[in-house]
């Protein structure tokens, strides 16, 4: 029987305006094809592949962190009707992973390169993996003797760090995330001219939400400037219609505001990715684990993608904080306007015994916080107790980290 643990969970009612009711709000999302997101996606894909290999061959996930991926932009010559990639982008995978177990070598670098290629092939249809990118692995080596490995049921935090989460999303946050998902999802069927490097910046002033969208075009699907601008107009209309599904606020949409028709300046690419022409990327420089960059909310600067999913609290606690915040809002009904969660680790402590879990709640007017405090504490305690459940969800690709 599991020993009951007394966790340091602090629940506090705070009096401040929730984000949704403030005069100004700014929210950003870097789409899956943005160079920073490409780095995140590859880092996480490599971690998943290594984890699966370790589990299959050794029965457990061995130590690794593959959170150092750099995307170095190439050079291209995009043209209406189809251009060419002149120099491939360069992708460097680094970090550290267990490469020797009981004297037996593990093909870490081969696993990493295959994972990166598979990820790119799965997500970016117009990228020629063999010619448009160069992928290199410089993952550092580590070795262990499994006979002396510590009990996996007693995993300790490998860092003193913190995770941050909040709920619920505001309309602006919901729309910014949904817009990128829409453009890189269902919209591809009707507008194949639009590539995967999408960035959405949301700016709300009172009850008007402005969306500025940078959308890379794929040149071979666009015959001339007239078609470019026709697609642009259609894109504005479709984004607007989709955004209005999520809000009663006014929505204004701007697409590729850097275009200059008279000077023949367009956002054209060969592959649908700006990394083909000098745009670089790094792990952790883009979206937080909830898929957004939110300067009006508390955030952690931790790079979660590629970190090991067993003991790295920078990954676990950021995702867990968001789960706890959302579950509190869901289970405690309409009395809550906003929940902020921060979980702090202390190196050497079990990951399910954080140094503190701080939960701040903004309630609706005339609500007695004492009605909810015990339930909120219980929700947080339960989710922390089951933090190990997140590991398999990371390995199975069921949890996003960017």
From Swiss-Prot:
Name of the protein this chain belongs to: S-adenosylmethionine synthase
Molecular function terms, GO-annotated: ATP binding; magnesium ion binding; methionine adenosyltransferase activity
Top class in the EC scheme: transferase
Organism phylogeny: Archaea, Methanobacteriati, Thermoplasmatota, Thermoplasmata, Thermoplasmatales
Catalysis: reaction(s): L-methionine + ATP + H2O = S-adenosyl-L-methionine + phosphate + diphosphate
Keywords assigned by UniProt, alphabetized: ATP-binding, Magnesium, Nucleotide-binding, One-carbon metabolism, Transferase
Gene3D superfamilies: 3.30.300.10, S-adenosylmethionine synthetase, C-terminal domain, S-adenosylmethionine synthetase, N-terminal domain
Annotated family: Belongs to the AdoMet synthase 2 family.
NCBIfam families registered for this protein in UniProt: PRK04439.1-3, PRK04439.1-5
Underlying gene: mat
Binding site for ATP: 140-145
Function: Catalyzes the formation of S-adenosylmethionine from methionine and ATP.
Example of a GO biological process term: one-carbon metabolic process
Native source organism of the sequence: Picrophilus torridus (strain ATCC 700027 / DSM 9790 / JCM 10055 / NBRC 100828 / KAW 2/3)
EC number, as in UniProt: 2.5.1.6
């Amino acid at each position: 029987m599991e020993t009951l643990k007394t966790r340091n969970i602090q629940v506090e009612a705070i009096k401040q305006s929730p984000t949704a009711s403030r005069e100004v709000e700014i929210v950003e999302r870097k789409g899956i094809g943005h160079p920073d997101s490409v780095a995140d996606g590859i880092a996480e894909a490599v971690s998943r592949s290594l984890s699966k290999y370790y589990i299959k061959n050794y029965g457990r996930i061995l130590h690794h962190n593959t959170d150092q991926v750099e995307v170095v932009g190439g050079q291209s010559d995009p043209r209406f009707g189809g251009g060419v990639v002149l120099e491939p982008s360069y992708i460097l995978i680094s970090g550290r992973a267990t490469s020797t177990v009981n004297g037996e070598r593990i093909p870490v670098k081969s696993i990493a390169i295959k994972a990166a290629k598979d990820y790119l092939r799965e997500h970016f249809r117009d990228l020629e993996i063999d010619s448009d990118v160069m992928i290199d692995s410089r993952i550092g080596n580590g070795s262990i003797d499994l006979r002396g490995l510590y009990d996996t049921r007693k995993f300790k935090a490998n860092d003193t760090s913190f995770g941050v989460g909040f709920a619920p999303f505001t309309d602006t946050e919901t729309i910014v995330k949904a817009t990128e998902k829409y453009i890189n999802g269902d919209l591809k069927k009707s507008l194949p001219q639009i590539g995967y490097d999408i960035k959405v910046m949301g700016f709300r002033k009172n009850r008007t939400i402005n969306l500025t969208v940078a959308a890379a075009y794929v040149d071979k699907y666009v015959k001339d400037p007239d078609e470019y601008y026709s697609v642009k107009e259609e894109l504005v209309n479709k984004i607007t219609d989709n955004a209005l599904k999520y809000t009663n606020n006014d929505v204004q949409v701007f697409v590729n505001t850097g275009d200059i028709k008279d000077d023949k300046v367009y956002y054209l690419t060969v592959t649908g990715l700006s990394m083909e022409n000098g745009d670089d990327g790094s792990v952790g420089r883009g979206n937080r684990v909830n898929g957004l960059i939110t300067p009006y909310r508390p955030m952690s600067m931790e790079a979660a993608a590629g970190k090991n999913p067993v003991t790295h609290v920078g990954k676990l606690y950021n995702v867990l904080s968001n789960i706890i915040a959302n579950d509190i809002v869901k289970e405690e009904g309409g009395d809550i306007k906003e929940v902020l969660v921060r979980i702090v680790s202390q190196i050497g402590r079990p990951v399910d015994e954080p140094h503190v879990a701080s939960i701040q709640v903004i309630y609706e007017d005339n609500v007695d916080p004492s009605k909810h405090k015990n339930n909120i504490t219980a929700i947080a305690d339960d989710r922390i107790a089951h933090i190990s459940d997140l590991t398999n969800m990371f390995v199975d690709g069921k949890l996003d980290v960017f």
